[in-house]
A protein has these predicted regions:
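Extracellular zinc-dependent metalloprotease catalytic-domain scaffold
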Residues: 6-23, 185
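Short, well-ordered beta-to-alpha junction loops that form the rim of enzyme active sites
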Residues: 5-7, 37-38, 115, 155-158
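Substrate-binding cleft of secreted/luminal carbohydrate-active enzymes
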Residues: 132-168, 187-192
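The substrate-binding groove and active-site-proximal loops of carbohydrate-active enzymes
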Residues: 1-11, 83-93, 126-136, 162-171
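Aromatic-lined glycan-binding groove of carbohydrate-active enzymes
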Residues: 18-132
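Carbohydrate-binding surfaces of carbohydrate-active enzymes
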Residues: 176-194
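Generic structural signal for well-ordered alpha-helices
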Residues: 13-20, 99-102, 143-147, 177-181
Length: 194
């Protein structure tokens, strides 16, 4: 299994074919490619590769494009213009609204993602944005909405100071791990295939 973080490069097919050939030469049945995408409306060609919707980017893009959110887009546009004149505007997104977009997305042929919170302002300053954490109820609703999918990839890689935390903290204690445990225990029979 090989995951391509940015899968829209022109040499992709040649590269994947080469990797597949090498895998077969070394006794494997081939390679499985997972392509990472941020735009749920543009998953590219159906090339047999598995598509993964990276969060929070995918749901944030759905949220920003939704006609329901025109006021948010206008406010954000004004904020970006004012940022060029002075400083102080940072885009703050309601995690529950972002999760709602994720819940409403119904494509079952993709691997879904999960991100519990986001804040890349330490790295990007005013160019960054914040996504507030969802409520426990919204998290559970999202998990219920994707429970029939085979895989879930949790974005908790905090290498670039983007606030994607899953691990215990002084502020949240074990909250997110406890949410996952609670949901898993509630759905234990489905997960074990019983």
């Amino acid at each position: 299994v090989f995951m391509l973080f940015k899968s829209d490069f022109k040499e992709k097919n040649d590269y994947v074919n080469y990797l597949n050939k090498r895998c077969i030469e070394n006794g494997f049945s081939g390679i499985v490619i997972i392509e990472t995408h941020e735009d749920a409306d543009n998953l590219g060609e159906d090339n047999g590769n598995i598509k993964f919707l990276r969060e929070p980017a995918t749901s944030l893009n759905l949220f920003r494009k939704s006609p329901r959110n025109i006021i948010f887009r206008l406010k954000n546009k004004i904020g970006k213009i004012s940022r060029k004149i002075s400083s102080g505007y940072i885009e703050i997104n309601d995690g529950n609204k972002i999760y709602r977009e994720a819940i409403n997305y119904k494509n079952k042929k993709v691997i879904r993602g999960l991100c519990l919170e986001w804040d890349n302002t330490p790295r990007h300053g005013e160019r960054g944005y914040i996504i507030t954490p969802p409520t426990k109820e919204m998290f559970m609703e999202y998990m219920d909405s994707i429970k029939d999918t085979e895989l879930l990839i949790i974005n908790a890689w905090n290498e670039w100071c983007e606030g994607m935390i899953l691990e215990p903290t002084e502020e949240n204690k074990y909250k997110y791990l406890e949410w996952i445990k609670e949901w898993s225990e509630k759905n234990e029979n489905r997960i074990d295939g019983v």
